[in-house]
From Swiss-Prot:
Keywords: ATP-binding, Cytoplasm, DNA damage, DNA recombination, DNA repair, DNA-binding, Nucleotide-binding, SOS response. One of its GO terms (molecular function) is ATP binding. GO terms for cellular component: cytosol. This is Protein RecA. InterPro entries: AAA+_ATPase, DNA_recomb/repair_RecA, DNA_recomb/repair_RecA_CS, P-loop_NTPase, RecA-like_C, RecA-like_N, RecA_ATP-bd, RecA_C_sf. Pfam families: RecA, RecA_C. PROSITE patterns: RECA_1, RECA_2, RECA_3. Gene3D superfamilies: P-loop containing nucleotide triphosphate hydrolases. One of its GO terms (biological process) is SOS response. The gene is recA. ATP binds at G77, P78, E79, S80, S81, G82, K83, T84. The keyword rRNA processing does not apply. It comes from the Bacteria.
Length: 362
C-alpha cells in the first residue's frame, strides 16, 4: 500500500459512506475480490449446511439439524463410550448424500467389519494410518485444502504422537510437545476448513488432572487449542446397559453439547447404542415421541394415533422396526416438533458446575 492510502482521515465533515467505499475498494485491490464483504450480501454465508449424526435426538439437540460443515468438531469421553461409533455414523450419513469421507486412524484400531455394519461404504472411504502426529496433520491439511472431502475424522488426538517423542527413548520428558503441535496445526487448518466447507471431527480422550480439590478433575488431551477452535464439543458417556433377559446387547448413552457456536449449548440427549447396529433409531422414536407427546404412554403400553405399538419399550421398538412406514411418520412428526423437543432438552441439561470452562470459551 502507498503512504497516501494509510493516511488517517481526521476531518469530521467527511462523508463516511464514501470513505468506507474507498477503503473497501483499496482492500479488494490489495488482497483480491471477496477479501471483505457485507455478511448479508451472500446468502450462502448465512445458511448453515449440516450433516446428520445418525441420531435424531442429537440432531435436534444441536439446534441446526446435525453437525455443521466447514467447522471443527470435538467428540470426547471415557473409553468405550461411543465416540468412534458416532463419528462413523456421521460418515455413513454423509456418504448416503454422495459425500467423500476420510478417516485418519492414528490409533490404528479401526474395525472395518463394525464400520460396515454401521452403514459405512468402505469402498469409498479414504483411510490413513500415519506413523507420527506431524504426518497425520499434514495428511489432514492436504485433504482439507483439496476441497474434495466432505467429512474428515481424526481418531484420536491422544494418539497424535510427535516425531521427537517417537524417535526419543522411553521415559524422556517432553512437556507441551503435543499441545504445541495441535496449536500450530489448528492455526493452519482453521481457514482452510472454512473455505473448503469440510467438516473435521477430532475424537479425543479424557485424562485426570492431579491435585484438583474442587470441580471436575477431567481434562482432554492435546492442550487447550482444540477447545477454542472447535465450534461444537460433544461429551459422550455410557450411563447403563441395554439387556435382553440376562444378555447385554447395547449401551445406554448420554451426549451433552458442552459447546455450540451455532445454537444454544448445554442440551443433552440419551439414546441406545446397540452392538453391531449403532444408534437405535426405533428406540429414539419411542423416547422422543413420549417426550413430545406424539407417542402416548399408558402404564406399560405405548400407542400412536390410537394404534398400540406394544407393551414395554422393547416391544414398541420391535413393532416400529417391523413397520417402517409408521416409524417414518413418527419421525416426520418429531422433526416438525423439533423446537419444542429442543427446549425440553435444554431444561433437562442445564450447565453443570464443571462446565464453567466450556461456557467461558464461548
Amino acid at each position: 500500500m502507498s503512504q497516501n492510502s494509510l493516511r488517517l482521515v481526521e476531518d469530521k465533515s467527511v462523508d463516511k459512506s464514501k470513505a468506507l467505499e474507498a477503503a473497501l475498494s483499496q482492500i479488494e485491490r490489495s488482497f483480491g475480490k471477496g477479501s471483505i464483504m457485507k455478511l448479508g450480501s451472500n446468502e450462502n454465508v448465512v445458511e448453515i449446511e449440516t450433516i446428520s449424526t445418525g441420531s435424531l435426538g442429537l440432531d435436534i439437540a444441536l439446534g441446526v439439524g446435525g453437525l455443521p460443515r466447514g467447522r471443527i468438531i470435538e467428540i470426547y469421553g471415557p473409553e468405550s463410550s461411543g465416540k468412534t461409533t458416532l463419528a462413523l455414523q456421521t460418515i455413513a450419513e454423509a456418504q448416503k448424500k454422495g459425500g467423500i469421507c476420510a478417516f485418519v486412524d492414528a490409533e490404528h484400531a479401526l474395525d472395518p467389519v463394525y464400520a460396515r455394519k454401521l452403514g459405512v461404504d468402505l469402498q469409498n472411504l479414504l483411510i490413513s494410518q500415519p506413523d507420527t502426529g506431524e504426518q497425520a496433520l499434514e495428511i489432514t491439511d492436504t485433504l482439507v485444502r483439496s476441497g474434495a472431502v466432505d467429512v474428515l475424522v481424526v481418531d484420536s488426538v491422544a494418539a497424535l504422537t510427535p516425531r521427537a517423542e517417537i524417535e526419543g527413548e522411553m521415559g524422556d520428558s517432553l512437556p507441551g510437545l503435543q499441545a504445541r503441535l495441535m496449536s500450530q496445526a489448528l492455526r493452519k487448518l482453521t481457514a482452510s476448513i472454512s473455505k473448503s466447507n469440510t467438516m473435521v471431527i477430532f475424537i479425543n480422550q479424557i485424562r485426570m488432572k492431579i491435585g484438583v480439590m474442587f470441580g471436575s478433575p477431567e481434562t482432554t488431551t492435546g492442550g487447550n487449542a482444540l477447545k477454542f477452535y472447535a465450534s461444537v464439543r460433544l461429551d459422550i458417556r455410557r450411563i447403563g446397559a441395554v439387556k435382553e433377559r440376562e444378555e447385554v446387547i447395547g449401551n445406554q448413552t448420554r451426549v451433552k453439547v458442552v459447546k455450540n457456536k451455532m445454537a444454544p449449548p448445554f442440551k443433552q440427549v440419551e439414546f441406545d447404542i446397540m452392538y453391531g447396529e449403532g444408534v437405535s433409531k426405533t428406540g429414539e422414536l419411542v423416547d422422543l415421541g413420549v417426550k413430545a407427546g406424539i407417542v402416548e404412554k399408558s402404564g406399560a403400553w405405548f400407542s400412536y394415533n390410537s394404534q398400540r405399538l406394544g407393551q414395554g419399550r422393547e416391544n414398541a421398538k420391535t413393532f416400529l422396526r417391523d413397520n417402517p412406514d409408521l416409524a417414518r411418520e413418527i419421525e416426520l412428526s418429531l422433526r416438525q416438533n423439533a423446537g419444542l423437543i429442543a427446549d425440553r432438552f435444554l431444561q433437562n441439561g442445564g450447565p453443570d458446575p464443571d462446565d464453567g470452562d466450556a461456557a467461558a470459551e464461548m
